[in-house]
Amino acid sequence: MKIAIFSGGEFLKTQLLPYDKLICADKGYEYAKALNLTPDFILGDFDSLGYMPQSAEIFPKDKNFSDTELAIKKAVSLGATEIDIYFSLGGRLDHELFNINLLKYAKNLGVTANIISGNTVVSLISGNGSYLAKKGNNVSLVPFSDEAHIIKSKGLKYPLDNIKAVRGETLTLSNVATCDEIYIEIASGEVLLICFL
């Protein structure tokens, strides 16, 4: 099951992908209303939204997890196999960085998660797979582990064949997609794949 989460970052014009259920975290409810969408679940402490929507699951402001993390937990409890998190970039830098790190949290729970904001898609990847891109647009791979060994790629202007992407270095910044689907094979480590669609 694919679940969409609306977070409370910057509200950018974004193409929504098909989903089975929608969870709104705090201010994400405002974005759902702006898009004339009815969420299946609403949760959070609502410090950003400023009021408590009807039928919302309400949590205290003094808690040890963010509203977006709560939404991921909820999605997993509902049986999600994939999660797309919208509107979680922009705004406060600390929230933005933690939202990106929540991709690892979802992965640890056995769920594939992506952040989608405007024309930007961020995914935490390892192993091998094919990914949506846009011909002519930038693709970057940011090392998430200390080192990632990329053994093969297809669909990139600058092939990533048998290279080591090291955290803190910029070797894999600003590649270019040569087609609308790219393939990346990683022998070890993890990278944040950032595609601009």
Specify the residue positions occupied by each region the protein language model found.
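N-terminal beta-strand-loop-alpha-helix module at the start
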Residues: 1-53
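Short phosphate-binding loop-to-helix
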Residues: 57-78
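A glycine-rich helix N-cap at a beta->alpha junction
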Residues: 58-61, 111-114, 139-140, 148
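Short Gly/Thr/Asp-enriched flexible loops that form oxyanion-binding sites at enzyme active sites
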Residues: 94-104
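A contiguous pocket-lining binding segment that forms or flanks enzyme active sites
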Residues: 104-135
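Long, charged alpha-helical interface segments
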Residues: 125-197
